[in-house]
């Protein structure tokens, strides 16, 4: 009866209490002092209902692990208790909190960590079993549990209970959005650890055999999308490196081609190098389907596994464009074979590499007029005055061909290009990437507007471009020549100015470029990449790790312990960065490092040639022909001369 009296007079402290007589219940029934005695007795006899137990952040912060161990855990894991717990209710709270109002995430994480660290497995099992009895919107609280390998099998069921109701996606998002970056990283660790352990155990070689994977991936995708909007962790932290390229992918592709949910629907968790290999496997499957169709329709004799182009070296661009522009997308994804008209030779990779190199150099010549070059950023951008749109379409096709032929291109675009290719909207701040100098000037205007009136500068809504020493003016908005920039319309001016240079002034050129690129690249596995990832696939990395190159190197008539091989790697690792690039050009015809680093570059060294001769190379096979020099000094002298004078030494 004391408990009932306390509830009536003081309340239990829970604004979400449902007990009709509890003062904390915003909808409680008032009882006068005269009625109190009889009411308490009758309630105690007939319908006594104890107010739900709940735990406040303040209580948690003062707890010790032993206090948690002694708690009647089950009493705190029912639906009503969870609704009230972990909230910092304001004094005299007079209404029921909505959603996750007043929730204190730090207290949830602390409590769950205490619980998992001091409880025995049976108690933890009860905790997991209790989740199914809780209303869906309260289950998200259990995203704050720590990951412990010994409870691995329970987490899959937890993720299922949290995500199986489609309506709950919004609840999950709402709950996570209120978390600090530190707490989001803890939830990320929970889901990532579960997925990593699952793939390590090999229990998901086939996606359709392990449905819990999908529930974890749904949750991980919510975190991934939140991270895109407001980064709380490096995007590479979403990679699950235990996904093995040697896994059985047939079921994954079967689901993928049928637009059904599977691992490839969440390709952001696949490390980039492995994902590129998966893209090639996807293409192989598509080519196989095309071949099967050709056989069934008696067109087999017309089917070629290669994209064969006959190119006139003296008319490189036109012959390349004519050879490519009308090809079917499925044909553009085939392995490229180049035949230069009038020249002897079979393309085993080297001729194609040369074609890519020649066409990129031609198209990116500043005097050719397709692109402008920023000397400070050392990057190219579309020339708004260029009017041969077919050439832009050609370079777009070339970028796509490079992806499917494992060619790293020596091009340098600002990263906004890859955003635009992936249909990611640009912002004013993206202009900083295109032209940092002008961007900083615009930011000075913004700072000026805080203390002064920018209208004093007499700026108008115009942009000026120089065309053959002639300045041409363009209105940023209708009638812009007559509209003065003021503090009130400054942000509009900044946005339109950035949009003009990033988008509207080069819209025709970019659209043609994108059309060519998309003619080759249509796979969701590529188009769902981040801009940084797509840039790496096309342009490679800048990490020249020669230790990784050595670990993956193959030898013929040498061994890793041969004196000449030891000499070579000692020399190679001591080279300057520019010399290392020249060595790569000499052997592979490219100084760019492929996705995954030099450890994923095929690199052969064979014993070939007279010790009096210089080293040579076969760029078709990334092979260095290294004579058996008798000491390191001679080898270094010969090798440096060869790479510094590479033209004429390579045997394509």
Where are these regions (language model features)?
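Intrinsically disordered, low-complexity, charge-biased terminal/linker regions in eukaryotic proteins
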Residues: 137-140, 154-157
């Amino acid at each position: 009866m004391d408990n009932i009296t306390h509830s009536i007079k003081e309340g239990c402290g829970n604004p979400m209490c449902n007990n009709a007589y509890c003062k904390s219940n915003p909808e409680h029934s008032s009882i006068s002092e005269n009625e109190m005695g009889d009411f308490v007795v009758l309630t105690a006899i007939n319908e006594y209902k104890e107010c739900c137990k709940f735990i406040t952040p303040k209580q948690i912060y003062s707890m010790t692990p032993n206090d948690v161990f002694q708690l009647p855990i089950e009493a705190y894991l029912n639906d009503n208790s969870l609704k009230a717990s972990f909230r910092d209710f304001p004094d005299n709270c007079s209404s029921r909190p909505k959603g996750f109002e007043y929730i204190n995430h730090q207290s949830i994480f602390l409590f769950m960590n205490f619980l998992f660290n001091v409880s025995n497995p049976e108690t933890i099992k009860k905790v997991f079993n209790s989740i199914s009895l809780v209303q869906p919107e309260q289950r998200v609280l259990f995203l704050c549990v720590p990951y412990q390998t010994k409870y691995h099998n329970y987490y899959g069921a937890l993720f299922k209970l949290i995500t199986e109701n489609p309506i709950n996606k919004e609840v999950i998002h709402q709950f996570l959005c209120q978390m600090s970056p530190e707490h989001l990283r803890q939830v990320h660790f929970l889901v990532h650890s579960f997925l990593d352990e699952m793939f390590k155990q090999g229990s998901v070689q086939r996606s359709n055999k392990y449905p819990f994977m999908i529930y974890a991936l749904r949750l991980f995708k919510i975190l991934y999308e939140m991270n895109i909007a407001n980064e709380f962790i490096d995007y590479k932290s979403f990679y699950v490196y235990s996904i093995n390229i040697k896994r059985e992918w047939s079921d994954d592709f079967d689901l993928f081609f049928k637009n059904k949910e599977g691992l490839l629907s969440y390709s952001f968790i696949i490390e980039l190098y492995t994902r590129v290999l998966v893209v090639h496997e996807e293409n192989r499957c598509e080519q196989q389907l095309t071949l099967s169709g050709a056989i069934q329709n008696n067109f087999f004799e017309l089917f070629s596994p290669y994209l064969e182009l006959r190119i006139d070296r003296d008319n490189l661009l036109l012959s390349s464009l004519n050879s490519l522009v009308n090809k079917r997308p499925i044909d553009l994804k085939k392995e490229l074979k180049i035949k230069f008209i009038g020249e002897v030779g079979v393309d085993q990779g080297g001729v194609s590499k040369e074609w890519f190199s020649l066409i990129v150099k031609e198209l990116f010549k500043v005097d050719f007029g397709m692109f402008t070059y920023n000397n400070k950023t050392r990057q190219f951008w579309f020339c708004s005055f260029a009017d041969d749109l077919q050439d832009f379409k050609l370079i777009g096709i070339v970028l796509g061909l490079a992806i499917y032929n494992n060619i790293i291109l020596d091009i340098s675009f600002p990263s906004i290009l890859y955003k635009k290719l992936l249909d990611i909207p640009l912002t004013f701040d993206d202009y900083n990437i295109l032209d940092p100098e002008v961007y900083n000037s615009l930011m000075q205007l913004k700072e000026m507007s805080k203390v002064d009136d920018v209208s004093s500068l007499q700026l108008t809504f115009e942009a000026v471009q120089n065309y053959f020493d002639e300045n041409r003016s363009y209105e940023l908005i209708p009638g812009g020549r007559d509209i003065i920039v003021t503090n009130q319309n400054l942000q509009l001016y900044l946005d339109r100015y950035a949009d003009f240079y990033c988008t509207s002034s080069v819209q025709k050129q970019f659209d043609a470029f994108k059309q060519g690129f998309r003619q080759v690249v249509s796979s969701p596995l590529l188009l769902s990449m981040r801009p940084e990832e797509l840039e790496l696939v096309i342009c490679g990395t800048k990490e020249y790790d020669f230790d990784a190159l050595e670990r993956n190197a193959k030898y013929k008539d040498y061994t890793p312990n041969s004196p000449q091989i030891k000499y070579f790697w000692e020399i190679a690792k001591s080279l300057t960065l520019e010399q290392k690039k020249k060595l790569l050009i000499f052997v592979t015809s490219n100084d760019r490092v492929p996705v995954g680093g030099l450890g994923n570059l095929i690199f052969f060294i064979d014993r070939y040639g007279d010790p009096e001769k210089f080293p040579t190379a076969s760029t078709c096979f990334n092979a260095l022909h290294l004579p058996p020099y008798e000491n390191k000094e001679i080898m270094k002298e010969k090798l440096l001369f060869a790479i510094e004078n590479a033209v004429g030494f390579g045997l394509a």
